[in-house]
From Swiss-Prot:
Name of the protein in its database record: Ovomucoid
Domain writeup: Avian ovomucoid consists of three homologous, tandem Kazal family inhibitory domains.
Protein localization: Secreted
Residues the record marks as site: Reactive bond 3: 18-19
Length: 56
């Protein structure tokens, strides 16, 4: 089972679209989409990782 990765190299972004493609972070928080998740990854200095796709 390979680790799940999301490419956040083009983040942070000042605004995210309101698309609903939830991701579950390693903080056990559900993020609405890749953009909001990647912004949180940047804010966490890379300590936040993706647990899985879908809601936590």
């Amino acid at each position: 089972f390979a680790p799940v990765n999301v490419d956040c190299s083009d983040h942070p972004k000042p605004a995210c679209l309101q698309e609903q493609k939830p991701l579950c972070g390693s903080d056990n928080k559900t993020y609405d989409n890749k953009c909001s998740f990647c912004n949180a990854v940047v804010d966490s200095n890379g300590t936040l990782t993706l647990s899985h796709f879908g809601k936590c």
